[in-house]
Each structure stands twice: as structure tokens, then as C-alpha cells.
Amino acid sequence: FTAIDIHHPNTFRLITDNHVDGVVVLGRCDKQTLSFLKKYFNCVAYTGLNLLEAKYDQVICDGYQASLAAMNTLIGLGHTRIGFIGETQFEDRYTGYCAALSAHNLRPAKSYIVNVPLSSEGGYKGAKELLSRKTDVSAVFCCNDNTAIGAMRAIKEAGLAIPDDLSVISIDDIDTAQYLSPMLTTIHIPVEEMGQMTAKILIDRIEEGHKVPIKINLPFYLANRESSPPRSEKTPAAEHEQTISRKEE
């Protein structure tokens, strides 16, 4: 179950009534969630993008480093005004966004940052909010692909072209990413391997195969596609205006 599900009465009833030997938690965990886990369960394994400061078995793909990679990709392509769409509290991807800007002596403007749930709906609303602020962003970093999908729809509905007017990059590399138009540039997270490794570690813990907490950090890579190409020196609109001027001369 996810960190969101854990406090639901039905979830608690399900795992206690069935005498669960161990649990796997997906996603972010706050202190309240950790206290709950410590109280009721001996064998706990966590998998996600945010490293936990706790003595539990963990299989992660470092969301902080993945965000740095995504941001460094955009900055390397010439973007200096980069928007953020996603969650900002207890979120390593937001921390990575800010750290990447700081490393390049760029300030994360508040108007560039939109705090929304990580979902297609959240991305859609987040992009509409960002665009309504009339910022001068040239690229947007979305916390995950579902958020990016919603954001891309809102950007297109606003009459903007991706990537000519606005580049988009995200994290996950779900199957849908390569079938979008344009195809989504994203950081590939080895979700299947993370799940398999977490299950193996939890079973080993239940069978008393190990007692010391294990932390495994799996690698990611950039799936470089169409939504984030090198930035042109001139925008299509500017080039169009120059063409008209030459014709008038």
C-alpha cells in the first residue's frame, strides 16, 4: 500500500485481521506514518524516490539525484527560467530542483513554483496556474510523468507549442511517455526492479535472513525524447516577426 493508504481504516483492518508478516510502503512517509509502522509492524520495507531517515529496509531510486539530472539537462540546453509543477513538502524532487538552480547561480522564483498533487489533474491545474501568472519560463520540470501529461494538455490548450514555446521534462518514464506528442523527455526510474528487490528483501527479513537494515539505491537514466530539445536562440514567434519585416522592406 501507499503512504496515503496507510491511515485509512480499511487498510489497517485488512493488514491486522489477516496477521500480516510484513508490509511494503510505497511513496513518501512522514513522521506520523513512521510512528504508526514502528508501533504495529516488525518487518517493514520501503520503496520510492525519497530516502527515509529511519532504520528500515529501503530500495530507492534517488529522487534528489534524478531531479538534479533533469534540471541539469534543461540548464545544459540553455534554459535558465524553469518552472516547477509538483509537490514541495517532504519531497526530494523539489529539493533537487532548488539545488540545481542554486548550483548554477539561478534563483528559484516563487512565481515559477506551483505546488499540486502528483497526478494528471494536478499537472493540468498546475500548468494553468503557472501560465496564468504570465511568467517568462521557457521550460517546466514536472515531478512525474502523470503530472507532465496533465501539464502538456494545459499548455497545448493555451495555444502554446511543445517544445517550441515551452519545453517539458519529468521523472518516471511510464509506458505512455513515449507515445505522447511530442514524446516526453523523462528520467527513467526502474520501477519493476525496485518492486522485485523490495519483495525479496522483505521476505528475507521475515525469514530472519538479515537483521541490519538494508538500503539499496538503484540507478536511473535520461530517456531523451522530443519535449526538451536544445533551446533555439530565437523563438519561432521572433523569427516569424523578422520574416514579415524583411518582406515589408
State each model region's role.
Residues 2-3, 9-22, 34, 38-46, ...:
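Bacterial carbohydrate/catabolite-sensing allosteric modules
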